[in-house]
Amino acid sequence: MATETTNNNVSPKNPAPTVPSSIPTPSISDEKITEMVERVKTDRNVRLSLADGIKDIVNRNLIIVGTGDGGCNIAQEINKACPDTYFVAYNTSARGMDKLNADVIIIPQEEDGSGKVRSYSKEVFCSANGYAQELLQAISSLADKINNLEYILVTTTADGGTGGGVSPMIAPFLNENMDLPVIILGVYPSLTEDATAMFNALQWQSEVEKTGCPYIILDNNDPDVSSKLQVHQKVNAQAAQMIKILTGEMFGPTNISAIDNRDMYMLLKHIGGRICIYGQEGKPPVGKSIDEYIMDMIQYTNSPAPNEVDGIGLFIKGPETFVKNADTSLTKICATYGNAAIRYFHLEVSDDPYIAIIMTGNSEPTDRLMIMKQRYDEIMNNIKKTASSVTDIMSDMNNPLSKPEKKTAPKNMDLSALDFFKE
């Protein structure tokens, strides 16, 4: 992994002073000329080596922190797609953790899952057992091994207890202590999940907004795929593809126009907000514009559509004729999703065409959140109706055993289990 290098020898030379004809010009020996020629050769080699380093400014590395079962599976998929990344897994359950290819695994030994209870996982993470400190130490240790480390990515499912509970805590915690931008990647639940999943996801979204950290949303709600496992695999693969675009894994050096690390920082951190990332191999067929090609990508990606976009990074890679003639005005994109205040472009000549776009500063996906709220209300109303029906049916019923004789309670009975019902 190469380290980004900057060529400081770029200032223009001052024009040579005019030498009056009356002053004799000193002669230069053959040895001096030979020395100067060799120095020029050396300087040229140095400049070429510095030029080789240009390719590194479009690539950036990150550490992934997978939280909970779903978050760790997402992180594993990203780690496979981006081999230069490091992967830390945090979970309150040991189930399946031995199958992960994580660099560091943190499991509270006295716990066995969170049972979808977000507050429980928060308490475990902040407990006196030091799991927050252990995570920070692991991240710090890995950071020392990585060149060109630019971001930390925290992955989770939004509806779970462990990842959904701790990810909005971990992100600002690492952001403050590591002095690195932290991005959260979360996945919304399918609408076929229970009311707790809807409630947890809505709580997670509200907390993520409060962190101020940039975030990416994917969605497990896919009516076209009936198998839950297939949906998860599809979404995890899309997450990996998004991060490959973000890290620059999909692109190389170019002398036309590049989105370097500073440009990406402006998009992801300075503008921030909700980040939407789309990419696809190939190029538009004859008769289809780049805008239409990208809008098709947006439609078929398991992610809420962009809205009120503030920043855009457009990546176009392909044959020279296609790249040079590409329409980068994005007129339809801006008219549909928001007229971004700032845009960056990466144009690269390559035999392997690929088009991608990063759209930042999006507001929260209100329409999708309202659908989850409606689903939650629907489930809870059905529960209330069922309870009311049972009450009505039993209103004139008596226990056929009449009133059984009570058993005498032991003198030293342990009543602590009843505390559970006091909440």
What residues fall within each predicted segment?
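Tubulin/FtsZ superfamily GTPase core signature
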Residues: 2-423
